Amino acid sequence: MPPKKKKVTGLIKLQIQAGAANPAPPVGPALGQHGVNIMEFCKAYNAATESQRGWVIPVEITVYEDRSFTFITKTPPAAKMILKAAGVEKGSGEPHKTKVAKITRDQVREIATTKMPDLNANDLDQAEKIIAGTARSMGVTVEG
């Protein structure tokens, strides 16, 4: 008889600073209500994201019936990557009136290449269009 599959009891999506997960909110309460060992998750997450310090990394945590868990880390949000490439703190309050920065087509290609596994795109051209659209909606002009 094949081994039984674990029954999934919850899916938690969080965005946590890489290498800096701690039991304080928002991590503690989100995991606590599902009965997950918070310190175990924090140690595993920090070890997995140590190389990406400085970024906010989205994570998808699957919680099973026996309170064990698995997690998948995603690539940093496109908006954060665009802001870093443009060298600004935040996007424009009114993106279609006031532009806050400019990024080059090469920077867009670089971000699209990094984000490719998480994007709903079949090729790099489509991925670049998605990233350029995100940039436009933040008041960042794409040149080239």
UniProtKB/Swiss-Prot annotation:
One of its GO terms (cellular component) is cytosolic large ribosomal subunit. Keywords: Methylation, Ribonucleoprotein, Ribosomal protein, RNA-binding, rRNA-binding. The keyword Ribosomal protein applies. The keyword Ribosomal protein applies. One or more lysine residues are methylated. GO terms for biological process: translation. Transmembrane segments: none annotated. It comes from the Bacteria. GO terms for molecular function: large ribosomal subunit rRNA binding; structural constituent of ribosome. Forms part of the ribosomal stalk which helps the ribosome interact with GTP-bound translation factors. Belongs to the universal ribosomal protein uL11 family. Part of the ribosomal stalk of the 50S ribosomal subunit. Interacts with L10 and the large rRNA to form the base of the stalk. L10 forms an elongated spine to which L12 dimers bind in a sequential fashion forming a multimeric L10(L12)X complex. This is Large ribosomal subunit protein uL11. It comes from Streptomyces coelicolor (strain ATCC BAA-471 / A3(2) / M145). The gene is rplK.
